[in-house]
Amino acid sequence: MTDNTTPAATAETLPYKNPDLPAGERIADLLSRMTLEEKVGQMMQLDARGGDLEDLIVNKHVGSILHTSPEDLSRAAKTVNEKTRLGIPLIIGDDCIHGYSFWPGATIFPSQLGMAVSWDPDKVKAAGRATAEEVSCTGVHWTFSPVLC
């Protein structure tokens, strides 16, 4: 670890933030700057409901959060940009096994296994598309779906 400056101050000079460099070079540079604690944190995905979001991001160095409220999505991004040493973006995940059920006002569908027994692939596809559109509008990158249970 050789760099203790904030991401905003050095974005132009850090190789891992340079989109013109090959991905492998950027990754090697970023990994060389990370502490063991930061590397372990990047492998964790923690539930953001009711917890201290800043603690998860700044102290636990999480790489991913799930079950995040609309308000917390922008707060999480701001925390990463302003309070973390390397500014590694979060991956936002959520369970979307019957629609975007953690988002107030989203469309709720039967479980995927329940929809499968309808033998109507077009309706199942339409439900998946509707869920994908609702989820993508909220900043979620990763859904845990489909499932077989």
Regions found by a protein language model. Give the residues of each.
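N-terminal beta-rich core of secreted/periplasmic extracellular enzymes
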Residues: 2-149
